[in-house]
Amino acid sequence: MKTSEERLVVPDSLSSDQAPAPVPQGSPVDENTDSEPVPQPCGGDDRSQVAADSVAGSVVFQEPQQGHPLPLSAPLEVEFNTPGELSPRIEEQELSENVSLPVEDTNQPELASGEDVEGVSEEPGPVDEGDAFWSYNFSQVPRYLSGSWSEFRAHSENFLKGCKWAPDGSCILTNSADNTLRIYNLPPELYSATEQVDYAEMVPVLRMVEGDTIYDYCWYSLMSSSQPDTSYVASSSRENPIHIWDAFTGELRASFRAYNHLDELTAAHSLCFSPDGSQLFCGFNRTVRVFSTSRPGRDCEVRATFAKKQGQSGIISCIAFSPSQPLYACGSYGRTLGLYAWDDGSPLALLGGHQGGITHLCFHPDGNLFFSGARKDAELLCWDLRQPGHLLWSLSREVTTNQRIYFDLDPSGQFLVSGNTNGMVSVWDISGAFGDSSKLGPVMTFLPQKDCTNGVSLHPSLPLLATASGQRMFPEPTNSGDEGEPEGDLPLLSLCHAHPEWQLQLWWCGGGPDPSSPNDPQDEKGQGRAEGCGDGLI
């Protein structure tokens, strides 16, 4: 646990008045009448051991014994009196939220010939205390900082399925093919007082294992590490209820159950907390179910998206809320987008235009624009809520499989970043593209690795880009190559041409030199070097 005297070393020498607090090492356990059985975490309740030793801190879900119900706390309640009002069971000293940062002069790097991308100013303006923010700068190739790869290469076919920063930026959540959610803290080297730092491989502080393939996962919308009662993760897996996990201990805190017309348990395909945290919206086949976060169980509101042969058909595969208007958008595997009123779910608009099932949605911070992406579809589409029937413009990317390929917007809404099946990461500057109906080209692309980049996530306050990679490998027919051997009826199958690179990577996107990384860590680890586009960029 970091103290208030420790200072954050910014790789590009940018300065601010506050660094994002790492996850505090504590968690409350409150009382509630509706309870769920949960396992006891490995290694007891010692929070300091969880942060120091990833193995000791890992939590593996096991079926709890009878007679040990877990009381669901009021953590999912969203009304708090003061930020410092924490559970009385938290005995550790809370991390100071005001971390002073050293002020250093920075020099803006020169752009390669032909580059016309504007970066951040050389000296960032003053920032209010408690509201630190660094701007993203994609005028040069992002610098590799750290990553995690050993965790995923221990088992075969354990590729990643996306990554998501916590709303407060204190940690990052990953999903992988071994049906495990992992939580990583920010690299401790960012808090080192030395200028020359060799970043070590990241290790997870928590592991939360689901029973089957994980369909979707998300952070609680009001999550803040300074308020442990808000630190939750929701996940949905095949033939299992929706689980709520404690992001401090990895314990299962609550479950939400949905049943079909035969009273059989059915799994949600998409999850999204409402902006105020009071409701959990879950996508099913032709249906959205709304659960109250203060009342776990099976009670929910059922909102049909398709009735009397009209409406949005197919499985609701993704849900996103507008940051400025009381509405939400739903994407379905039926290749349609639906806009609905938040209060009662009444349909507002139905849009089409994708070639495949919708896999991801994202609203612009201004609330007027939203973006959609689909599987086996080479376009990201931009829509304007002021003209819902009119497609504003499209962005080209490579998506050749059914895998969910994420994209993300930076907090200012200037840059949109997306992964590709070929491993490339594409960056678009959309700040000046409004009103232009033509296709917008990327300002920069780089190659983190040779495998599919399926997950990208931009930090909410630091210029940090997280990427997740990997995909399912299918054997390809090949010849034996041995002379004299009779050819069989069936061709041989081989993975000799596959290059699996399953890893989580962190990239600094703030521009300027990186004094904390004197050597290129990718060359030392044998990873592919990132390259740019244009004259100095690819």
From Swiss-Prot:
It is found in: Nucleus, Cajal body; Chromosome, Telomere; Chromosome. Keywords: Chaperone, Chromosome, DNA damage, DNA repair, Nucleus, Phosphoprotein, Repeat, RNA-binding, Telomere, WD repeat. WD repeats lie at residues 154-194, 210-255, 260-301, 311-352, 353-393, 399-438. Pfam families: WD40. One of its GO terms (cellular component) is cytosol. The keyword Nucleus applies. The modification Phosphoserine is found at S27, S87, S480. Gene3D superfamilies: YVTN repeat-like/Quinoprotein amine dehydrogenase. Residues 1-53, 92-128, 471-491, 509-538 are annotated as: Disordered. Residues 529-538 have a biased composition (Gly residues). The modification Phosphothreonine is found at T478. Signal peptide: none annotated. Preferentially expressed in testis. One of its GO terms (biological process) is telomerase RNA localization to Cajal body. GO terms for molecular function: histone binding; identical protein binding; protein carrier chaperone; protein-containing complex binding; protein-folding chaperone binding; RNA binding; RNA folding chaperone; telomerase RNA binding. Residues 113-128 have a biased composition (Acidic residues). Belongs to the TCAB1 family. Component of the telomerase holoenzyme complex composed of one molecule of TERT, one molecule of WRAP53/TCAB1, two molecules of H/ACA ribonucleoprotein complex subunits DKC1, NOP10, NHP2 and GAR1, and a telomerase RNA template component (TERC). The telomerase holoenzyme complex is associated with TEP1, SMG6/EST1A and POT1. Interacts with the chaperonin-containing T-complex (TRiC) complex; which mediates the folding of WRAP53/TCAB1. Interacts with COIL. Interacts with SMN1. Interacts with RNF8. Interacts with histone H2AX. PANTHER family: TELOMERASE CAJAL BODY PROTEIN 1. RNA chaperone that plays a key role in telomere maintenance and RNA localization to Cajal bodies. Specifically recognizes and binds the Cajal body box (CAB box) present in both small Cajal body RNAs (scaRNAs) and telomerase RNA template component (TERC). Essential component of the telomerase holoenzyme complex, a ribonucleoprotein complex essential for the replication of chromosome termini that elongates telomeres in most eukaryotes. In the telomerase holoenzyme complex, required to stimulate the catalytic activity of the complex. This is Telomerase Cajal body protein 1. It comes from Mesocricetus auratus. The lineage of its organism: Eukaryota, Metazoa, Chordata, Craniata, Vertebrata. The gene is Wrap53.
